[in-house]
């Protein structure tokens, strides 16, 4: 389901950048129930009803969490995360547990770095109107400098699910930068 959601969020981003408008017609009096005028080869298993109805405060909180990571401020980063958090790491590992346990994992990794530079290339607020769930998706390049001198750069695409002003699910996809 996470891969499907990733594909949907990427498709939504690409389509939202298009200046051409696609006409949709309402199939009922419910404003969230819309049918595409185009006969599509797939039906979304999660949802195809998206808006950008995520608060600017939630967007700022998510983007600030990246700044806190870059600055090594794990205490502030912790405040952005829910009490219970699910994380899908870019290496395929999964974490489902308490905020404090996640911060121990992230602190250990961040402590191995002397600096982190993030070039935030873009973001998109996404609200699943039928599921009533908000997300902030991000695209960025991160350059990590390890204390031993090694420098590693990669491009990332993250999905941050936001509930009650906190990140409760975080999924990360990584593509190494060419050397």
What does each of the following model-derived ranges do?
Residues 18-71:
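Short, low-complexity N-terminal intrinsically disordered segments enriched in polar/charged residues
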Residues 94, 143-153:
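Short, cysteine-centered beta-strand-loop-beta hairpins and adjacent loop/turn segments enriched
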Residues 132-142:
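A short hydrophobic beta-strand element
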Residues 22, 153-178:
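Short beta-strand edge/turn micro-motifs at domain boundaries
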Residues 74-126:
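A solvent-exposed, acidic/Ser-Thr-rich amphipathic alpha-helical stretch
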Residues 1-4, 19:
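Positively charged n-region of N-terminal signal peptides that target proteins for export
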Residues 13-16:
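C-terminal motif of bacterial Sec signal peptides marking the signal peptidase cleavage site
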């Amino acid at each position: 389901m996470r891969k499907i959601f990733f594909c949907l969020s990427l498709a939504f981003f690409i389509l939202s950048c298009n200046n051409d408008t696609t006409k949709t017609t309402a199939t009922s009096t419910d404003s969230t129930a819309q049918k595409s005028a185009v006969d599509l080869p797939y039906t979304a298993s999660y949802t195809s009803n998206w808006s950008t109805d995520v608060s600017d405060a939630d967007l700022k909180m998510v983007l600030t969490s990246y700044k806190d990571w870059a600055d090594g401020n794990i205490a502030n980063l912790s405040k952005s995360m829910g009490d219970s958090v699910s994380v899908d790491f870019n290496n395929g590992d999964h974490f489902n547990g308490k905020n404090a346990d996640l911060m121990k994992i992230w602190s250990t990794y961040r402590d191995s770095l002397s600096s982190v530079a993030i070039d935030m290339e873009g973001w998109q607020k996404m609200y699943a109107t039928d599921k009533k769930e908000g997300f902030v998706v991000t695209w960025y390049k991160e350059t990590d400098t390890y204390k031993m001198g090694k420098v590693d750069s990669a491009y990332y695409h993250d999905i941050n699910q936001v509930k009650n002003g906190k990140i409760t699910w975080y999924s990360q996809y990584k593509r190494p930068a060419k050397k």
